[in-house]
Amino acid sequence: MDIDNKPRIHWACRRGMRELDISIMPFFEHDYDTLSDDDKRNFIRLLQCDDPDLFNWLMNHGEPTDQGLKHMVSLIQTRNKNRGPVAM
């Protein structure tokens, strides 16, 4: 997936679990454009992971072994925490 194809990335952010939507969508909407190209690629790679893995990582029930994905999970958690609750 191309890092500049925002409609496709937006679609990929839509998950089958509301908990993931609440974590991933606000990050995409508020922070994606500020990411470096490397972080955008890592975000896209993260979106290609299975929902159960994403859920566990974002809820601190484990972490990815891949350092780029680990960094992205941490970045999503930090930015979402700093932003505060987001209504969906």
Curated annotation (Swiss-Prot):
Pathways per UniProt: Antibiotic biosynthesis; prodigiosin biosynthesis
Effect recorded for D21A: No change from wild-type
Sections of the chain in a coiled coil: none
Pfam family, one: Sdh5
Record's note on what induces expression: Transcribed under both aerobic (with succinate or glucose) and anaerobic (with glycerol with or without fumarate) conditions. Part of the sdhE-ygfX operon.
Protein origin, superkingdom: Bacteria
Effect of D51A: No change from wild-type
Classification via InterPro entries: SDH (IPR005631), SDH_sf (IPR036714), SdhE_FAD_assembly_factor (IPR050531)
Gene Ontology annotations for the cellular component aspect, listed alphabetically: cytoplasm
Effect of G16A: No change from wild-type
Phenotypic consequence of R15A: Partially restores aerobic growth of deletion on succinate, less growth in LB, slightly decreased SDH activity, protein expressed at low levels. Wild-type flavinylation of SdhA in vivo, protein still interacts with SdhA
Gene null: resulting phenotype: Pleiotropic effects. Under aerobic conditions no growth on succinate, 90% reduction of succinate dehydrogenase (SDH) activity, no incorporation of FAD into SDH, however the SHD enzyme complex forms stably, more SdhA is incorporated into the membrane. Decreased aerobic growth rate in rich medium (LB). Partial growth defect during anaerobic growth on glycerol fumarate medium; greatly decreased incorporation of FAD into FRD. During aerobic growth 50% decreased synthesis of prodigiosin antibiotic, decreased transcription of flavoprotein desaturase PigA.
Key words, A-Z: Antibiotic biosynthesis, Chaperone, Cytoplasm, FAD, Flavoprotein
Gene Ontology annotations of biological process type: antibiotic biosynthetic process; respiratory chain complex II assembly; succinate metabolic process
Localization in the cell: Cytoplasm
Job of this protein: An FAD assembly protein, which accelerates covalent attachment of the cofactor into other proteins. Plays an essential role in the assembly of succinate dehydrogenase (SDH, respiratory complex II), an enzyme complex that is a component of both the tricarboxylic acid cycle and the electron transport chain, and which couples the oxidation of succinate to fumarate with the reduction of ubiquinone (coenzyme Q) to ubiquinol. Required for flavinylation (covalent attachment of FAD) of the flavoprotein subunit SdhA of SDH.
Known partners and oligomeric status: Monomer. Makes weak or transient interactions with SdhA. Interacts with YgfX. Interacts with FrdA.
Family named by the database record: Belongs to the SdhE FAD assembly factor family.
NCBIfam families per UniProt: PRK10878.1 (NF008130)
Name under which the protein is recorded: FAD assembly factor SdhE
Recorded name of the encoding gene: sdhE
